[in-house]
């Protein structure tokens, strides 16, 4: 892969670059086969390298009274492939529910995005749903700058390349770029990259519900403060059996357990032996969230960054959470954030919703 241009890549100047609020952009094209491959404009908006930001989170999580591990450990390139298998598994109802809702409502949802807007997708993933939305915007003759924000460079590049095949830069009204970084990085980038045009943030796949209701409110507050509006897709299913089937099957097990080798890779040691851990899922009724855990198969002593952490057989480390919030709960979360649900599109059973959120 040839990097054809880049704004300063000098690591030493990184802190001064960040302090001037300039984010690195790189433009590259793949020419291995000599074919005309489109360039990818990728902005590295990370304020810290991934290992630098995640290792302290792993340590803090092991030190905390209720042990937890950063959910971001799940989202490396391999994690995204494993998540694709989750999306394809017949028991994973949120994927089919969101697809059919988007299919039915995509034209109406797209009316909330105007020509000239900047559309930023948080946690863009495989961008299959994105393609549906961008096709609709194109059919509505809108010119849109689309930015896919996600955390793994190689997965982001691969998925952008696939999307670019559908929307070639030369002939399409839709211009595609990438933002490499977390949601927080993206919020910081937005603050220093104000645009004259309106910004719409799209958060699909129930991803906002990976945070507690309080954290979700804080994210909304932060994004709305940049003057953006938000399109948020959320699962409101309350059927416990269906949730357990969907989140506790073999595909989910593999997806969650992949966090352990990723932790080892970032720590540079084999602190977590995957054979020592099992996966379990549970419903947390206080938070209206499903929670996934690593469970110690035997008594363990883990050495991480020079400290030893003891686990008795059966003790857990919490991994990812997935909230199941019906409309009333979503409205409450938005209100807490100083926002308001301006419009919403629900499936017939009212178990899945897409919400348009703006400042109150
Ligand atoms: C549940 S998947 C949803 C993917 C896609 N939007 C969809 O609807 O199929 C969550 C996506 O968010 C990304 N992600 C998770 N945590 C993130 C964070 N803190 N900042 C940025 N992206 C994140 C993951 O890499 C993944 O692509």
Where do the model's predicted regions map?
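A short, conserved alpha-helix within the catalytic core of class I
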Residues: 209-226
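Class I SAM-dependent methyltransferase SAM/SAH-binding core
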Residues: 136-185
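N-terminal auxiliary segments of SAM/dcSAM-dependent transferases
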Residues: 2-73
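Conserved class I S-adenosyl-L-methionine
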Residues: 116-125
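Conserved beta-strand signature within the Rossmann-like core of class I S-adenosyl-L-methionine
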Residues: 226-239
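Glycine-rich SAM-binding Motif I of class I
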Residues: 127-131
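Class I SAM-dependent methyltransferase Rossmann-like catalytic core
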Residues: 66-111
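Substrate-binding/catalytic lobe of Class I Rossmann-like enzymes that use SAM or dcSAM, i.e.
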Residues: 242-337
């Amino acid at each position: 892969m040839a990097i054809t241009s880049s704004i300063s890549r000098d690591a030493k100047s990184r802190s001064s670059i960040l302090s001037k609020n300039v984010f690195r952009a790189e433009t590259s094209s793949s020419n291995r086969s000599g074919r005309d491959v489109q360039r990818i404009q990728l902005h590295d908006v990370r304020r810290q390298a991934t290992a630098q930001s995640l290792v302290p989170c792993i340590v803090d999580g092991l030190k905390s009274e209720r042990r937890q591990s950063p959910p971001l450990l799940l989202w490396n390139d391999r994690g995204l492939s494993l998540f694709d298998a989750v999306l394809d598994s017949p028991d994973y109802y949120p994927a089919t529910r969101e697809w059919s809702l988007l299919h039915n409502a995509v034209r109406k949802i797209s009316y909330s995005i105007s020509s000239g807007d900047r559309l930023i997708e948080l946690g863009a993933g495989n961008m299959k749903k994105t393609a549906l939305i961008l096709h609709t915007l194109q059919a509505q003759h809108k010119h849109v700058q689309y930015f896919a924000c996600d955390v793994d460079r190689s997965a982001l590049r691969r998925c952008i390349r696939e999307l670019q095949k559908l929307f070639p830069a030369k002939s399409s009204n839709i211009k595609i770029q990438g933002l490499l970084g977390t949601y927080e990085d993206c919020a910081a980038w937005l603050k220093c990259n104000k645009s004259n045009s309106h910004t719409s943030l799209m958060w699909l796949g129930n991803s906002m519900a990976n945070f507690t209701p309080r954290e979700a409110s804080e994210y909304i507050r932060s994004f709305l403060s940049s003057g953006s509006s938000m399109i948020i897709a959320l699962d409101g299913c309350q059927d416990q059996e269906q949730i357990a089937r969907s989140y506790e099957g073999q595909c989910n097990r593999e997806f969650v357990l992949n966090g352990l080798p990723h932790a080892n890779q970032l720590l540079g040691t084999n602190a977590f032996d995957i054979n020592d851990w099992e996966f379990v899922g549970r419903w947390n009724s206080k938070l209206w969230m499903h929670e996934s855990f690593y469970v110690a198969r035997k008594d363990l002593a883990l050495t991480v960054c020079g400290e030893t952490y003891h686990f008795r057989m059966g003790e857990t480390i919490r991994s990812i959470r997935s909230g199941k919030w019906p409309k009333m709960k979503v409205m409450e979360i938005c209100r807490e954030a100083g926002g308001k649900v301006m419009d919403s599109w629900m499936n017939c059973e009212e178990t899945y919703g897409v919400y348009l959120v703006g400042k109150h």
